[in-house]
Amino acid sequence: MTANIPVITIDGPGGAGKGTLCKAMAEALGWHLLDSGAIYRVLALAALHHHVDVESEEALVPLAAHLDVRFISTDGTLEVVLEGEDVSGEIRTQEVANAASKVAAFPRVREALLRRQRAFRELPGLIADGRDMGTVVFPDAPVKIFLDASADERAHRRMRQLQEKGFDVNFERLLSEIKERDDRDRNRAVAPLVPAADALVLDSTELNIEQVIEKALQYAREKLAVA
């Protein structure tokens, strides 16, 4: 039964460091990895590719139900494949991120993608990265972590990432977009962004990634009694 397969959920807002933490934990434990945020981004990108209105739940549901998405882990990086095409870079644009937050707010869209996310639960275990992994998708997960950081710190991190890729970034605009997205995610009617009652809340604002990984792995191993 899949219920016997352990899951570590890592929830939190964008820019808190969830992706880096999940890859490090998956590598350390030798577990599978699910980037649930990527699924919503892939759906948003598919909608943009197929000219489907990202604000129309009716139009998005059939697209979500037949979404052709795969995750391929290669040399420590996660390749996201949509309809046979590597879209790992394309789904990380701010346009797609904003669209993903909109499509994720629709109840029927979330339901259409729920089964697909749960299907990633395979032995020896799963690291699930998202916003409602511990509250909705895997409520029975034995280890739940909510990774947070201030909006200002997350905006600075995102700005550095984009600048390293050669993009010209306006910090105030980026901060405003992050705050708007936070407000939308935390206050939506369906699966709002909140820590699970039994989650460890880990604030990464003043921590470097190595410290975050160390704290998260220590907590997970204590909960799972994994050597």
From Swiss-Prot:
InterPro entries: Cytidylate_kin (IPR003136), Cytidylate_kinase_dom (IPR011994), P-loop_NTPase (IPR027417). One of its GO terms (molecular function) is CMP kinase activity. Keywords: ATP-binding, Cytoplasm, Kinase, Nucleotide-binding, Transferase. It comes from the Bacteria. ATP binds at residues 12-20. It catalyses: CMP + ATP = CDP + ADP; dCMP + ATP = dCDP + ADP. GO terms for cellular component: cytosol. The keyword Amino-acid biosynthesis does not apply. GO terms for biological process: nucleobase-containing small molecule interconversion; pyrimidine nucleotide metabolic process. It is an enzyme of class 2 (transferase). CDD domains: CMPK. It is found in: Cytoplasm. Its EC number is 2.7.4.25. PANTHER family: CYTIDYLATE KINASE (PTHR21299:SF2), CYTIDYLATE KINASE/PANTOATE-BETA-ALANINE LIGASE (PTHR21299). Belongs to the cytidylate kinase family. Type 1 subfamily. HAMAP family: Cytidyl_kinase_type1 (MF_00238). This is Cytidylate kinase. The lineage of its organism: Bacteria, Pseudomonadati, Pseudomonadota, Gammaproteobacteria, Enterobacterales. The gene is cmk.
